[in-house]
Amino acid sequence: MLKKTLLSLAITASTAGLTACNISSIDNNDDVAKAPIQAGQPGQAPATVSPLFNPARGQLPLATDFLFGFPKAEDGKTPKYATDADGTLYHKGAYEINLLEERISLIQPGQEGYNPVLNALNEMDGVSINAELDIPLNGNIDIASVIPGKNIILLPLNYDDPLIDEDTKSGESPFKAEFTDYTVSVVQYATPPNEAEKFALRVNLTKPLASKTRYLVILANNGSDSIKSIDGKPMVMPVQYKSLAGDDTLLSSKLAPARKLVKNWTESAKGYLASKQQDPNGLVMAYTLTTGGGVEVLSTMAAPGNANSDLKQDPALRAVVAKAFADNPNDVAAAQQQAAGTLVGAPYNVPAGSVAAVIGLATSLETPGPRAISLPAAGVDLDSDGEIGLNIANFIPSYANTTFVNVLTGSIDLPYYIKAPQGAYTGENALTAPGYLCTPSSASDALCIAGKTSAGNTIVSQWEADDSLATDLQNPALTPPSANVTRLFPFAKKNGMRKAPVLVVKPAGTVPPGGYPVVIYQHGIFGDRTDSLGVAKQLADAGFVTVAIDLPLHGVMPTDVISGTTTPIFASLLGAKGTDISGFDAETQALYVSGETVAERHFGLTRDAVEFKPTAVSGTNPALNGSGSLFINLVHLQTARDNMRQAVMDLLNLNASLGSIDLDNDGNTDIDVTKVHFIGHSLGGIIGTTFVATNNLNGTTLNPNGNAALPLITESVFGMPGSAIPRLLEASASFGPSIKAPLTTSTENGGFGLLENSESYNQLFYVFQGALDSVDPASFAQAMNQIPGNLAKYMVIESIGDQVVPNSAPSPLAGTSPLAALLGTTQIDTGTSDFSSGKFFVRYKDADSSHGSLASPGKDLIEADAFTEIMTSTINLFSGGNPAVTGSTVAPIAAE
């Protein structure tokens, strides 16, 4: 069973290939320090203040390059363990270890000793680019004495990629310009009454760190500009750091790797201080950290031509072929010739006899591309006016007098990279496979039991590296060293295809010449595709078609969670005009409840009402009808990440397929793919920011190595989104309590037993953020901001006082306003006349709006005006104009 006790994240000496030697004492120097020592006794301040630095005792900043201190083979360079070659971090506590201190395997969910935080840390390809950096201290300090750029310095080093290149760039300065986008604060961690006080110097990022970059962190006193304790004493170098940086005989030869690192850090830091005309002898401590990926995985999945050409493995080979076909879109022979010429040379060295096979396999990669969107045939699903589809009044009764909008329900087959439950892929029948919704006939019904067990894939599965090229070519050299999808191995393996429902809302009447402009809509957490209907009606009145799909693990449920009655639109979506499924036979009702009739993306599963585990949805119990209730979880942080990455890939495929939409069944496309727009609400805006950035940066409009199948998203609206997702969730008035509850509940009562704001609690959020960096909009916003506003405009909407996605949070990157800032938006109000930036930020008054103002029209009359004003400015923007905002609900720009 899952062991929920979270172990300390203190970095043990084994991280750097050390035994746990106490280098400050000769006695008991082979004892293992299994827990961090205390800085002092309760109520006693240290005589001098210094950073905590003792690798043998696990006293280090969490984010250091000790996490890359892998054991080496006899040559001193090759990683001892093949899985270390994937570029991920290492922490001993996540592994089964034998008596020889050798790794056996990573402890997985369900196994004794499983720790979700350590498990996620070991699969990160570097430290977080968005989370705050904590430097533990042995006492409190005067924060006013800490001066960024003077006595605390964040210095990026000059590597192409520190995980590929051992040395900085030859002939160039080893240092880049200092990173200055941060503030500093002192954190006092919560501790039990019988433990010493704990403090840390926190570096609060106001912009993300650069991905795949090594940073040198320097703490240094500079004359009067010294870091001081609260009683005015200058900070001093830690004793253990000084010992490792010196030349005295080590107490154990196993400390040699740590000494090598510390000496390099010290030499680099002193050299840089001297170049700044600062006293090198003022150095207090220095260390390096190496950041993980940001945009790399999704950018490479979107357009394989972006893969790093230095890599000699599967992704790079596929990238060579993809680029050749992108360079020669209308000449297959020329593309094959170009690819062959590159593959046979260095660094790839593919044997001539294997080139054709490489090209054939590489072109089969599931890159986002056109896929058929199936819609009702002519004469089927007609509304009362004879139009194909259902009138929108079938869904929203208040629109009963609407005769100009029709709704079509169809489907699209999408590549699925997370493992689905058994029987859930296209072509399988979950109810007869036997699948995961079967009922075992006996304890020996192995097939059914295995199928039901596979439902657990929804909470513990994750993307795995694509190994098909190595397998199909029978060339072990091309095998990824692990299953981890990282910036070095960015291609995920497709597990199958999964049919997803598509909801299309169109204006009634004849298709205009050239086709309709189109809007992709993405709903928020716990919602479904029908959340688009209120917005889509307004858009249809203005001549736009709206296309919506569900997020992974979301979909229409048979029972309304509020009223407890059968969802009227559930029957409507299946083509029935009634409002209840009770009139159908039992077998059909079972199909409806499971979602298999329309292949709902929740697989007919929802969260158990008591525990966080999947269970079948109910046709009668609204408590078992939570769309998206399994989407974000703390059981396996990588699953939450990959649900989001899957959502981005789904939207990329949907965008690439818009040209296949035939609304009147005349065999011709009815969508103008030069006029593609996007609206995302809440989580849909969060994921939507990452999607639009990935799409626009990797289409051929802006990227010569891009994917020509991806139309440019010309205008976007991100409604109530936010960045730095873990801290956003923690600060949310709506979600915060449910996020904190399992963390702070005692282990005896099934929780993780953490003290809120303790060191371990903060480390959990650090790792959670690091796990999500490759999909968090904070990682993509600055790159998106580089796109000229005349090519792709966008608008961020904020409701002041939002109780779901906070406007801001204690973590500077978390919330709506920080994301708007990263995107380079300019706030506009009713008095704005300059719209030249193309990047806008609109804030709606607290009293007149809420988080749901974009998605829930008509539910709150007070907010009706806000919805109308949001849609008016949206339609203005999508119609090629400016998002001129009018009305009383828009908040004025605050005076400077």
Language-model region placement:
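N-terminal cap/lid segment of alpha/beta-hydrolase-fold proteins
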Residues: 384-514, 644
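Cap/lid segment of the alpha/beta-hydrolase catalytic domain
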Residues: 461-491, 511-652
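Acidic carboxylate motifs that coordinate Ca2+ or other divalent cations, activating on Asp/Glu
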Residues: 385, 666-668, 802
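A catalytic-pocket lid/entrance helix-loop region that shapes and gates access to the active site
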Residues: 34-43, 239-265, 562-586, 686, ...
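C-terminal motif of bacterial Sec signal peptides marking the signal peptidase cleavage site
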Residues: 16-20
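Gly/Ala-rich beta-loop-alpha elbow adjacent to hydrolase catalytic centers
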Residues: 677-689
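C-terminal subdomain of alpha/beta-hydrolase-fold enzymes, centered on the catalytic histidine
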Residues: 503-506, 517, 635, 646, ...
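Acidic, low-complexity Ser/Thr/Gly/Pro-rich repeat segments typical of extracellular/periplasmic
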Residues: 23-424
